Amino acid sequence: MILPWLILIPFIGGFLCWIAEHSSKTLPRWIALLSMTLVLILSLWIWATGDFQLAPAPGGEPEWTLQFKVLWIERLGISIHLAMDGLSLLMVALTGLLGVLSVLCSWNEIQRRIGFFHLNLLWILGGVIGVFLAIDLFLFFFFWEMMLVPMYFLIALWGHSSDDGKKTRIYAATKFFIFTQASGLVMLVAILGLVFVNFNATGVITFDYATLLKTQLSPHVEWLLMLGFFVAFAVKMPVVPVHSWLPDAHAQAPTAGSVDLAGILLKTAAYGLIRFALPLFPNASAEFAPIAMWLGIIGIFYGALLSFAQTDIKRLVAYSSVSHMGFVMIGIYSGSQVALQGVVVQMIAHGLSAAALFILCGQLYERLHTRDMRKMGGLWSRMPYLPAISLFFASASLGLPGTGNFVGEFLILIGAFKVVPVIIVIATFGLVFASVYSLIMIHRAYFGPSQSDEPILGLDARELSMVLGLAVLLVLLGVYPQPVLDISAASMHGVQQWLGAALSTLAGR
C-alpha cells in the first residue's frame, strides 16, 4: 500500500498548497517542503528494508520488490498497477531529493501565486513518480501526459523572458508542450497497436505489462511499434534533431522548473527506453541499436559544439545536457550489463550535477538579474563560495574522477567498448569537448575584467546547504557507487537478457 502514497502525497500536498495560499504566503512553501521530504524518507525506508536482488528468469515475467494492483476499467483490461524494482526505486529517490531542492531553491524567487506555483510543482513531481511506478501501459501513458500541463504553467506563468526579448516564456512553454504532446500521441498509437495485436492473438484486451511482453509480433509491426515508443522517448530525452524545445524551456523556466526538467524529466525518457522499449520490442531494438548509438554520438558532439556558442549561461547548461544524454543513449543500446549499470549511475549523477548548476545559475540571476555571461566576469573576487562551488560542479559535469559522473561515463565506455569499439573511441573525444565548454562557462562568468564594482551578496545558509549537499552526494557516488550498482544489478540483468538475446540472434544470422 506504500506505492500509491508515493504518488498521492505530492498530489494532496499540491492541492493543500493551493488552498493555503489564501491564509499565508509561507504556509504553501512549508507544505510543499514537508510533502517532498516525506516522499524522500519513504523511498529511503523502502531502500533500507526491501530486497532488490530478484532477477527475472530468462524469458520469464519481471520480478518486483513491491507491487500494488487494483482493477480500474475492467472492460478495457486497465488496472492501477504500480510496481517497484531497483531501477524505479533509485529514480523515485532522486525525484524526492530534487523535489525537496526545487522547493528550497524557489523559496525567495517566487513571490506571486505561491500556492498555485507549488500546486504545479508538486503535481509535476507526482506525475514523474507515477511514470517510474506505473506498469499498466495505460496508466504509464496517463502519468506521462499528466506531467506536461503543470510544466507548461510553471514556465508560462513564472518563467523569464530572454535578455534580448525575442523569446518569451509563453513561446518556450508552448514549444515544450507541442513537442512533448505530439510525440506522446505517437506513443499512444503504438500502445494501442500493441494492445490490438495482443487482442487478435488472445481475444483479451489488456494493458498489462507482463502480458504484453509475451505478445508475438511480426518484424514489420514490431519495428513500427518500437519507433512509436522511441519517438516519444527521444523527444523527452532529448535526441538530436528533436531537441530544440529544451534550451528554450530551460532558459525561460524558473529555477525549480529547470531543476525538475534536467534532473528528473529527462530521466523519464531513459527510464522509458529501459523499462518499455527494449523489453517489449527486443528484436526491433537490436536492429535499431546502431542507429540509436550514432544518434547518441551526434548528440554528444552537437550539444558540445552548441554549448561553445552560448552567451546565456542556462542555455549552455541545457545544451550540455543534450551532450550528456548522448552517452546514456549509447549505454542503453549497447546491450552490455556494465554499460547499462553505467547508465543508471550517469542518470543519477547528471541529475545531481545539472540540478546544482541550474540552482547556481538561479542564484546568479537573483543577484545580477541577467543570464548573459558577457555581462558577468570578474565575479571570483567579488563573491565568496559561489564561484568555487560552480567550478566543482562544472568539473564534475565533464567527468572529474572522484565524482559520480566519472563513474557513470567510465562504466558506459568500458561496457560498450566490447560491443561497438569504433563508436566508443569517437564518443571519448566528446569528453574533450565537455572540458572545453565547462571551462569556457567558468572563465566567462567568473574571471576576466569586472563589469561592476558594486558589492554582491554571498550565499545564505539555505543556498549554501543545497549545493554543498549535492556536492557531497556526487562525491559519495563517485567514491563509493556500490550501493547504487547493487540495487540496480537485478533490474539491468533482466533488461540485458531481453536485448542481449536479440543482439546474439542478430549477430548469428
UniProtKB/Swiss-Prot annotation:
Keywords: Cell inner membrane, Cell membrane, Membrane, NAD, Quinone, Translocase, Transmembrane, Transmembrane helix, Ubiquinone. One of its GO terms (molecular function) is ubiquinone binding. Its EC number is 7.1.1.-. It is an enzyme of class 7 (translocase). It is found in: Cell inner membrane. It catalyses: a quinone + NADH + 5 H(+)(in) = a quinol + NAD(+) + 4 H(+)(out). One of its GO terms (cellular component) is respiratory chain complex I. One of its GO terms (biological process) is electron transport coupled proton transport. InterPro entries: NADH_Q_OxRdtase_chainM/4, NADH_UbQ_OxRdtase, ND/Mrp_TM. The chain crosses the membrane at residues 1-21, 30-50, 87-107, 123-143, 176-196, 223-243, 261-281, 288-308, 316-336, 342-362, 376-396, 422-442, 467-487. This is NADH-quinone oxidoreductase subunit M.
